[in-house]
Amino acid sequence: MKKKIIRLSTIPMSLDILLQGQLRMLSEHYEVVAVSSPGSDLEKVEKREGVRTVAVPMERQISPLRDLVSLFRLIRLFHREKPWMVHSLTPKAGLLSMMAAWICRIPVRIHSFTGLVFPTASGLKQKILIATDSITCACATTILPEGKGVHRDLERFQITSKPLNIIGNGNINGIDLEFFDQTPAILEQAEKYRKEEVVTFCFVGRIVRDKGINELVSAFQRLHQAYPNTRLVLVGPFEEQLDPVLPETRQMIEQHTAIEWMGWQDDIRPFLVASEVFVFPSYREGFPNVVLQAGAMGLPCIVTDINGSNEIISESINGCIIPSQNEQALYEAMEKMLNQEERQKLAQQARPQIANRYERKALWKELLKFYRSLEG
């Protein structure tokens, strides 16, 4: 009989996007149950991955009463399912499921830390975040930081004294190199968005403050004034409530003739192929998939010196690394990328650097090996 494992995230989109294909792979070796808040993405996961799913409502934000209800629901679920392992990702699912699994005495309790919020927070908020992550670690038997930067921050802030393990070279699920490739079909689609004799900078992600959008738009505005043969393509949704960009930034995005906002896109590959440079000036990350994806599509990347990004990108090899929240450094990096010879040199190494370290099936092999080591 296969051992049972439960994989959790707070919202179903995380299971859908971050663990694509991984749950199906694991189901060949274990009985897999996927758990998250309800939603159409959870139904999508069940059909695509071929695993059983269970909906347990969980709030992303702090909500003591609702969190308590979610905790009791998870305890009831774990009592009923009696899994060998509970493995969570995302903060709230991690906190609640590790507590519930500890109460239920589940033998193997794993939490994967992706992006950490507390290193860039301050005051009471930072103390609360550190406390909740410390509780998660106290209840877990095994802790998996997504990369070296997350590993370093967990140690630096003394979140736990337990051993920390990174799977492979980092990242949750690796990169599907067959999907993220310049196939003839993608090249054809990209022609709709390409502009000749224009250097296109592309950003993919939420259009929010802590992705560095204010600095990016301001730096590009200056760049375009000096070099009119430039364009900025933004792929991703605005967020009105959580961390919105400045009003003047949004106005510039909507009105500037050389800035094209594409909104949410199910397939970002044509936009990457239609661009010359990928720009990701985020303030904080765990291990950004989108930088892996841009590199796999052959783009040199400009990234900030933050966790994950500075592990994927090597200075002057497949991109350049700049200080976070530094508009002038961003401007200078974008200006440097206008040199075609420099771009091509970095682009040649972009895909090989990703393929050698983050190929998906290689990471799956390492994850499965790690799971097997816990079976005892």
Could you say what each language-model-derived stretch is?
Residues D16-G21, V199, F203-R222, Q328:
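A conserved mid-protein helix/loop that constitutes part of the nucleotide-sugar donor-binding site
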Residues V35-S40, N171, V204, R231-V245:
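Glycosyltransferase donor-sugar binding loop
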Residues V54-A55, S134-I186:
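Donor nucleotide-sugar binding/catalytic pocket of nucleotide-sugar-dependent glycosyltransferases
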Residues G236, L246-G263:
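Nucleotide-activated donor-binding/catalytic signature segment of Leloir-type glycosyltransferases, i.e.
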Residues W264, Y283:
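Aromatic "clamp/platform" in nucleotide-sugar-dependent glycosyltransferases that forms part
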Residues V291, P300-V303:
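Short hydrophobic beta-strand element within catalytic cores of glycosyltransferases
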Residues E315-S316, C320-E327, K336-E341:
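Conserved acidic donor-binding segment of nucleotide-sugar-dependent glycosyltransferases
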Residues E342-R357, E366-L368:
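A short, well-ordered alpha-helix in the C-terminal region of glycosyltransferases
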